[in-house]
Amino acid sequence: MSRRHSAEKREIIPDAKYGDVVLTKFMNSIMYEGKKSTAERIVYGAFDLVESRARANPIEVFRAALDNVAPAIEVRSRRVGGATYQVPVEVRTERRQALAIRWLIQAARGRNDRTMVERLSAELLDAANNRGNAVKKREDTHRMAEANRAFSHYRW
């Protein structure tokens, strides 16, 4: 990691349909090999399914899902005198959002439905209702932090 120059933050353009910057980040995370139109089709298709199944605004469901998946605390390894401790630390806001997006997509890809549209919509609905693998991942992270609470004084 360079000490001299840090990478400058690029401006992310809000998506065309809902005008949401976080949704654009979500699409960019879903995207493979630069195929943005495919990622858009997947996300918008999933949102249409969410709207028809839940009879709710898909953006609200998406925000609720992200809030339910975002971790407040995580463990980081810290080496002290030959021993490695898992030290619980708070998660910065940007990293919270990035982890929530990453975990939602991983959980959706790990589901058994036929298409990615169906998998993503099911995972979004589950996460919005505090169920599903993405929420389980957050719970596991919090459990690890709670178990290693004794090492919190090693925080840096």
Swiss-Prot record:
Family: Belongs to the universal ribosomal protein uS7 family.
Signal peptide limits: none
UniProt record, GO biological process: translation
Annotated PROSITE patterns: RIBOSOMAL_S7
Entry annotated with the keyword Ribonucleoprotein: yes
PANTHER family cross-referenced by the UniProt entry: RIBOSOMAL PROTEIN S7
One function term, GO molecular function aspect: structural constituent of ribosome
Gene Ontology CC annotations of this record: small ribosomal subunit
TM ranges: none
Function of the protein: One of the primary rRNA binding proteins, it binds directly to 16S rRNA where it nucleates assembly of the head domain of the 30S subunit. Is located at the subunit interface close to the decoding center, probably blocks exit of the E-site tRNA.
UniProt protein name: Small ribosomal subunit protein uS7
Swiss-Prot/TrEMBL keywords: Ribonucleoprotein, Ribosomal protein, RNA-binding, rRNA-binding, tRNA-binding
Subunit and partners: Part of the 30S ribosomal subunit. Contacts proteins S9 and S11.
Gene3D superfamilies per UniProt: Ribosomal protein S7 domain
NCBIfam families: rpsG_bact
InterPro entries cross-referenced by the UniProt entry: Ribosomal_uS7, Ribosomal_uS7_bac/org-type, Ribosomal_uS7_CS, Ribosomal_uS7_dom, Ribosomal_uS7_dom_sf
